[in-house]
UniProtKB/Swiss-Prot annotation:
InterPro entries: Glyco_hydro/deAcase_b/a-brl (IPR011330), LamB/YcsF/PxpA-like (IPR005501). It comes from the Bacteria. This is 5-oxoprolinase subunit A. GO terms for molecular function: 5-oxoprolinase (ATP-hydrolyzing) activity; ATP binding. The keyword DNA repair does not apply. PANTHER family: 5-OXOPROLINASE SUBUNIT A (PTHR30292:SF0), UNCHARACTERIZED PROTEIN YBGL-RELATED (PTHR30292). It comes from Burkholderia orbicola (strain MC0-3). Pfam families: LamB_YcsF. Forms a complex composed of PxpA, PxpB and PxpC.
Length: 254
């Protein structure tokens, strides 16, 4: 059994270089919600040195709200914005001897693409037109994953170690109780259940089936690094190989 571990980096949390020793995929902020050219270059350089798969983490242009405020934009604007951010990170990756392997939208763009076909198609079209060999990371069972596969992209279904789920498989909004899980033992057990048994218990009590192919480890918070170490150690102790997804692995559940 195999699983990818990913983290969102270049967002000013301070533990990026150390997290790259634990994850197999890095989603690097492209400057629109956090980060900037220097942060992007640092993260890319570290990822290349450590052999971690490089991914772009595009967002709405909304640094004031860390890219977490929902926006209603024309699909053409979303398409152009994603292309712009992919181009920036790709140039830096090329200069550092690496290349982008995947794309994972950030924040509100991620959540809206997960449920809105128009937004999903705009993001997918930008990725496909930029480089159809790129894999797409998205919420398991989401509209975004379906759109990516429909376009012929490798789709990697993502689950979250420390986020609450609703019965429809969507994440509990951060503004609501139960959105974030703070108990480390509960998160460890939940992660193992998602990876080995392909299910998660929703906030309302139902079991939700999902195809976990990559687990997001959040890098912010004072104990994030130590907790990431615990999650990786628990997975390896359970006999799970932690590896970056290839195109064939990505679509094994399609």
């Amino acid at each position: 059994m195999e699983i990818d571990l990913n983290a969102d980096l270049g967002e000013g949390c301070g533990s990026d270089e150390a997290l790259l020793d634990l994850v197999t995929s890095a989603n690097i902020a492209c400057g629109w919600h956090a980060g900037g050219a220097n942060a992007m270059r640092d993260c890319v350089r570290w990822a290349v040195q450590k052999g971690v798969s490089i991914g772009a983490h595009p967002s709405f242009h909304d640094p004031e709200n860390f890219g977490r405020k929902e926006m209603q934009l024309p699909p053409g604007d979303i398409y152009a914005g994603v292309l712009y951010q992919l181009g920036a990170l790709s140039a830096i990756a090329q200069a550092e001897g690496g290349r982008i392997a995947h794309v994972k939208p950030h924040g509100a763009l991620y959540n809206q693409a997960a449920r809105d076909p128009l937004i999903a198609d705009a993001v997918v079209s930008a990725i496909h037109d930029f480089d159809p060999s790129l894999a797409v990371f998205g919420l398991a069972n989401s509209v975004f994953i379906a759109a990516a596969r429909q376009a012929g992209l490798a789709a990697v279904e993502e689950v979250f170690a420390d986020r609450g789920y609703r019965a429809d498989g969507s994440l509990v909004p951060r503004s609501l109780p139960g959105a974030l899980i703070d108990d480390e033992d509960a998160v460890l057990a939940r992660t193992l259940d998602m990876v080995r048994n392909r299910q998660v218990r929703a906030l309302s009590g139902e079991w939700v089936p999902l195809n976990a192919q990559t687990v997001c480890l959040h890098g912010d918070g004072p104990h994030a690094l130590a907790f990431a170490k615990r999650i990786r150690a628990a997975l390896e102790a359970a006999g799970v190989d932690v590896v970056a997804p290839g195109a064939l692995q990505a679509d094994e559940g399609a």
